[in-house]
Structures are given as structure tokens and as C-alpha cells.
């Protein structure tokens, strides 16, 4: 809306100082092109389903992560998504994905960048999150999901894993450790609930 206001203001200025309509039309086309590029950039940065950062933006951002930096990497996804899809339908599965994405974003986005990289998989990284604090953030995410579950009429939970990137470590290696941590949490969920892994 801010950029649209600038365009309107520019159009008024052009009408005041440019008597040649061709100049006005060319300038208007130029400003509209800028607006189009800006909107494409905004849309490309965010995942359309969940509102978190997109997979495209994720690949752009990891290119700028320092190889020698120290930061926390986390992964999360919905528990029992196949069970939800099979028993209730894919539209409910989509609601679960949205809920996990939004809950993760709401709890962590002030401290971390959160991306949806596919399906129900979310990845994030942060220089300010500390490993010792992650359990309370994970509890907060699932508390938010519990609130959503009451509104949606079915249970939505998430498993979250995390790892610390150490200087000199390859990012993919850190991501793999976070993924392994997530699957430990996921196995604990299935053991606790009695739901079979692929249900």
C-alpha cells in the first residue's frame, strides 16, 4: 500500500509538470513496472499456503549463511499427517500444515527465519536462539497447536528437531543433524500415542 501511495503521488506530480501525455503514459508504465517487480519479489518471498517464508527464499538465504558462523538450525513437521489425510481428507491435511506453519512462525519469527521447504516440512535458522531454550519454544508451538486443534476439531501436533551449526561445518551436515533430532522427537510421539508410523 505504501508503494501504491507513492505511485499515486508520482502521477499527480507528472500531471502538474508534464503537458505531454506521452510523457505521462511512459512514466506511468515505468512506475507500474517497478510496482509489478516489487509485488513479484514479495510474493516470491512468502509461501502462499502458510504465510511463512518460501522454499525459493530459503535457497536464497542459505547462500548467505556464514560458513564459520555459529547459529541454530531447526526442522519441524506435522505429526500423523498421513493419518489426517486418509481419515479426514486432504483439505484437513492442508489445515494441519497451515496450523504447524503459522504456529512455528508466531512463536519463533521474532528470533528466527522460518521457511516451508515442501509438504509439511519447515526449516529455520537463528543466530539468537540458544539450544537450551528450544524445549520451551517447542512446548509453546505445541500449546498453540493445541488451541488450534480445539477450533479445527482434530488434533494437530508437530515434532521439532534442532542442531547447532559450528564454525567450519557444512550447512547440509547441520541440517541433517537437525533432521535426525526431529525424527527422534517424531518416534517419541508415535510411541506415546500408539499411532503407527505410516498411518
Where are these regions (language model features)?
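Conserved long alpha-helical elements within nucleotide-processing catalytic cores of c-di-GMP signaling
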Residues: 54-72, 79-109, 115-119, 123-124, ...
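Interfacial "cap-and-anchor" motif at the non-cytosolic start of specific transmembrane alpha-helices
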Residues: 1-44
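A cytosolic-side transmembrane-helix exit/cap motif
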Residues: 43-54
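Catalytic-core segments of nucleotide cyclases and related cyclic-nucleotide turnover enzymes
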Residues: 135-142, 146, 150, 157, ...
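A structural signal for short, well-ordered beta-strand segments
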Residues: 73, 122, 158-162
Amino acid at each position: 500500500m505504501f508503494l501504491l501511495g507513492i505511485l499515486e503521488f508520482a502521477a499527480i506530480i507528472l500531471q502538474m509538470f508534464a503537458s505531454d501525455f506521452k510523457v505521462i503514459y511512459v512514466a506511468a508504465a515505468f512506475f507500474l513496472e517497478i510496482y509489478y517487480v516489487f509485488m513479484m519479489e514479495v510474493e516470491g518471498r512468502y509461501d502462499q499456503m502458510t504465510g511463512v517464508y518460501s522454499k525459493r527464499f530459503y535457497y536464497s538465504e542459505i547462500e548467505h549463511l556464514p560458513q564459520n558462523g555459529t547459529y541454530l538450525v531447526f526442522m519441524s513437521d506435522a505429526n500423523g499427517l498421513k493419518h489426517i489425510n486418509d481419515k479426514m481428507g486432504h483439505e484437513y491435511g492442508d489445515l494441519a500444515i497451515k496450523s504447524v506453519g503459522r504456529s512455528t512462525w508466531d512463536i519463533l519469527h521474532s528470533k528466527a527465519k522460518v521457511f516451508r521447504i515442501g509438504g509439511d516440512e519447515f526449516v529455520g535458522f537463528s543466530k539468537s536462539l540458544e539450544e537450551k531454550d528450544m524445549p520451551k519454544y517447542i512446548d509453546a508451538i505445541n500449546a498453540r497447536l493445541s488451541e488450534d486443534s480445539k477450533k479445527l476439531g482434530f488434533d494437530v501436533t508437530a515434532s521439532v528437531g534442532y542442531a547447532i551449526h559450528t564454525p567450519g561445518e557444512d550447512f547440509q551436515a547441520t541440517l541433517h543433524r537437525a533432521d535426525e533430532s526431529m525424527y527422534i522427537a517424531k518416534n517419541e510421539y508415535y510411541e506415546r500415542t500408539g499411532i503407527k508410523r505410516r498411518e
